[in-house]
Amino acid sequence: MEKLEMLYEGKAKKIYATDKADEVIVYYKDDATAFNGEKKGQIEDKGIMNNAITSVLFEILEKAGVKTHFIEKLNDREQLCKKVEIVPLEVIVRNVAAGSMAKRLGLEEGFKLKTTVFELSYKDDSLGDPLINDYHAVGIGATTFEELKVIYDMTAKINDTLKAVFKEQNINLIDFKVEFGRCADGTIVLADEISPDTCRFWDATTGEKLDKDRFRRDLGNVKDAYVEILKRISK
């Protein structure tokens, strides 16, 4: 397997072509951003830790019956993945009110929601990834109602699986976002990453934040939080 030209560079990753048309190499960077790119910085070894965390979690999800783009971890910063067409939507899963949802709805951060809430955002940095509903998503041609049902069903399975995994490690999964891709045959798979960049993790005993909020909110010990998540899920 040969690494070829870079196809795309995002805020946290680079995507490279390979000598196989249906496979790509994903490289994890140390760059950190928040507030739709308004705050920028670097977290030492973040790419190494997010690659490791995502690899572990995607393998767990595959075993639980969730199809993903992940094939294998290649080295500290790279993984081999199926080449997919990204659905231009983010599904945000909220088990507990925090962050923008708490602010938007006037809820105290940490409020336990009566049901898990799914939110949908349109992936467009220039627009600030606006929240939309299912009808917007279908109306603008981003997806279909049939595809959305598959995505929501997969998201529910991902949430149930990850909550159980992190509960065993004394961590509450507060919220997270996921992205999906279409394989060449139209199959929907989980794509992107699952890491402290894309999730809120709170220690179940102390309430300590173990995620990118430490960077967003200048709480300090950012790298330590990523290290702690990797340590707990690697037991």
Curated annotation (Swiss-Prot):
GO terms assigned for molecular function: ATP binding; phosphoribosylaminoimidazolesuccinocarboxamide synthase activity
Enzyme Commission no: 6.3.2.6
Pfam families: SAICAR_synt
Keywords associated with the record: ATP-binding, Ligase, Nucleotide-binding, Purine biosynthesis
InterPro entries in the cross-refs: SAICAR_synt/ADE2_N (IPR028923), SAICAR_synt_PurC (IPR033934), SAICAR_synth (IPR001636), SAICAR_synthetase (IPR050089), SAICAR_synthetase_CS (IPR018236)
Catalytic activity: 5-amino-1-(5-phospho-D-ribosyl)imidazole-4-carboxylate + L-aspartate + ATP = (2S)-2-[5-amino-1-(5-phospho-beta-D-ribosyl)imidazole-4-carboxamido]succinate + ADP + phosphate + 2 H(+)
GO biological-process terms attached to the record: 'de novo' IMP biosynthetic process; cobalamin biosynthetic process
Keyword presence, Nucleotide-binding: yes
Pathway per the UniProt entry: Purine metabolism; IMP biosynthesis via de novo pathway; 5-amino-1-(5-phospho-D-ribosyl)imidazole-4-carboxamide from 5-amino-1-(5-phospho-D-ribosyl)imidazole-4-carboxylate: step 1/2
Entry superkingdom: Bacteria
Family of the protein in this entry: Belongs to the SAICAR synthetase family.
Name under which the protein is recorded: Phosphoribosylaminoimidazole-succinocarboxamide synthase
